[in-house]
């Protein structure tokens, strides 16, 4: 997943997911943020990644699997935990937010 970075916006009532592409030594936004549970963020992210035909199936599956893990964690216990704990649990994901 080094070609892409899963970004998470960690909020009290929602979690949002986006993907950036690694370009040189920086990153470039690849998708907008998709919010859960306000919308079906996973399904929206899946459709967005599928529309970018140059993303390999392997990269897409890795991103979606990690998104699933983060959403499940947030639903089951994470929404009541500080963002710092989520960062420790998912060190390969970039977090930002207010929680």
UniProtKB/Swiss-Prot annotation:
Disulfide bond annotation, renumbered to this chain: none
Biological processes, Gene Ontology terms: translation
Keywords: Ribonucleoprotein, Ribosomal protein
A GO term from the CC aspect: ribosome
Domain of life of the organism encoding this protein: Bacteria
GO function terms (MF aspect): structural constituent of ribosome
Gene3D superfamilies recorded: 3.30.390.140
InterPro entries xref list: PSRP-3/Ycf65_sf, Ribosomal_PSRP3/Ycf65
Subunit structure as annotated in this protein's UniProt entry: Part of the 30S ribosomal subunit.
Function statement: Probably a ribosomal protein or a ribosome-associated protein.
Family statement drawn from the similarity comment of this UniProt entry: Belongs to the chloroplast-specific ribosomal protein cS23 family.
Family annotation (PANTHER family): 30S RIBOSOMAL PROTEIN 3, CHLOROPLASTIC (PTHR35108), OS04G0461100 PROTEIN (PTHR35108:SF1)
NCBIfam families, alphabetized: PRK02724.1
Name of the protein described by the UniProt record: Probable small ribosomal subunit protein cS23
Upper taxonomic lineage: Bacteria, Bacillati, Cyanobacteriota, Cyanophyceae, Nostocales
